[in-house]
Design a protein with these regions (language model features):
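A general structural signal for well-ordered alpha-helical segments in protein cores
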Residues: 40-41, 80, 180
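Electropositive phosphate-/nucleotide-binding environments in soluble metabolic enzymes
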Residues: 34, 89, 176-180
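Active-site neighborhood of HAD-like aspartate-dependent phosphohydrolases
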Residues: 10-71
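Generic alpha-helix structural propensity
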Residues: 35-39, 60, 77-78, 90, ...
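C-terminal cap/substrate-recognition subdomain and adjoining C-terminal extension
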Residues: 2-17, 21-23, 97, 104-243
């Protein structure tokens, strides 16, 4: 566990208010929503080293390119193959600690001001905040902890009985339908007294199902009317007038 002074972007977790007439949940995607662009490749470079990471990406150039074009299962499979090439045999505990160091070093400079302001608004209002991402669970856990979120849902990675990662998924990549399923399960586990009001923030087509089930969905993408989430209201610096 690292010991250091809190950075300016870190947020203290705010307990839920007993005075809230109806429970409110805010779900945030991570890459491209809370942060500028993707972070998984940077994370892999930090964990495995730049040379090994670029070499693995070169060997897997064809499936990675096909996955980028086709998205969906092709992208999921290519990502898993890259994880297996770079993470297999590594200590899960060590990768978790390395992830914490990576977040402390890199997250602050990549956070998007509007999204961070909205997350803080939800926390200050006593809402329950959860980060839902296709990034590895151990990585998302650290981000959620640093930002003060109440929950973290990410892609779970398999490990052997000795605690060494295989690099493969434990379940499915947390995007699209899986992201929605995991979020629904998390809501059910909270045992709210009534169905909560849901705010959801995303930036890509992998977030569409999550936004579709939200009471208040927001598009945090940079493409605006050209993006895949153009039907949804844009995230602005002004707090919403509801909830």
């Amino acid at each position: 566990m690292l010991t250091r002074r809190p950075k300016a972007w870190e947020t203290s977790r705010v307990p839920l208010s007993d005075e809230t007439p109806k429970p409110v949940v805010a779900a945030f995607d991570l890459d491209g929503t809370l942060t500028e662009g993707g972070s998984v490749f940077r994370w892999l470079r930090w964990i495995a080293g730049a040379r090994r990471t670029y070499a693995a990406a070169l060997r897997l150039a064809v499936p990675l390119t096909v996955g980028a074009v086709r998205s969906g299962r092709a992208a999921d499979n290519a990502k898993e193959r890259l994880f297996m090439a770079l993470l297999a045999g590594r200590s899960e505990a060590q990768v978790t600690e390395d992830s914490r160091e990576f977040i402390l070093e890199h997250l602050g400079g990549r956070l998007r001001p509007k999204a961070l302001a909205r997350l803080r608004w939800h926390l200050e209002a006593g809402h329950d905040v959860v980060i839902v991402s296709a990034s590895p669970q151990m990585y998302v856990n650290v981000v959620a902890d640093q930002l003060g979120a109440h929950g973290a849902l990410g892609t779970r990675l398999a490990a052997d009985p000795l605690g060494h990662l295989t690099g493969g998924y434990l379940g499915r990549n947390c995007r699209g339908a899986e992201k929605m399923r995991r979020f629904n399960d998390w809501i059910s586990e909270r045992r709210y007294p009534e169905e909560p009001i849901v705010f959801a923030y995303g930036n890509s087509r992998g977030d569409r199902r999550l936004l579709r089930l939200a009471t208040h969905p927001f598009n945090a993408g940079k493409l605006g009317r050209l993006g895949s989430l153009r039907r949804y209201p844009r995230l602005t610096s002004e707090p919403p007038t509801t909830a």
